[in-house]
């Protein structure tokens, strides 16, 4: 009996890119009263092995350029590519007050301007403006798109934009030096795909979401709920870059003398918590919207289980977590079965969520089928369908139980003190 060895990651990557290029995902129109669109670029490259260096002269394609499948075939047939290490480019956004995604690990990209001809042009323009990388020309191949997502806030109820991811691969051995935009980008990081696919780097991000409840009940409710519900826990990947570039003018890495000094009470509170890490000392965590889009891509690579990178968000307080699990048990079971049935039919990973927003991959209903990723089905939040309402209900039930328990304890202590005082007379 003979056993075939599994394909290398570069061979799997070639097959995946070929599939994506031949099976585009559909265009998603904006929901009513939601005119904004944004695009991001997933940029791949192959890092050569020390034992198989590329030729000094780059491969030049004749003009006009061959079709995408031929360009990919010519690129992946080279020895240094077969033995190389595929990597994906990430950015860390600069710290900006009032920015929903301040200091987040993300993909290069931004919102669409009136002068942009297409969503793809937005990704190309923003990548050039943010990190100085030109994705046009013979040194880079545009592969295709990934599922577009409707990004919503207020726990999935208010759409704010349509997010469009596009995939590119750099096919030249030499990579140009990046020029980071200090006002927007703190650093860039190349992370091997084998690291992103490894279970050992999976972790969690913890976010304070009491501000969400403040909108419903005011500052008093926020102050009461903050110690009661704890922090919200999200799935994450701890990035281990092979190469990083830092923008030396950003305040994440160099403190400013003009920053106001903390009061003695603030310093005492920081000391009580065990100190406060600088931005540069914090781990690079991939989570939220960016994790959802990256999981869409990684799930098409062996072992095709990157959707498991995502877990249902929950809270750190054990009792509230138990209540949420009880309320959402049947919902999660139902949605997981639906996702398994559509994981590779073009529906993709349906979930991406961070502390403030949710991104749901959507597909057009009806219309002609063009390739495998065109589907008749209108998929709207397979994994998160019904979960938000149950989770919010669980939070309020848990908070109510804690408050009633606290009041009961206070009443018991008062009664006990009065009885003890009466006995002493």
Each PLM stretch: what is its role?
Residues 1-125, 129, 133-163, 167-177, ...:
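N-terminal leader/linker segments that precede catalytic domains of diphosphate-processing enzymes
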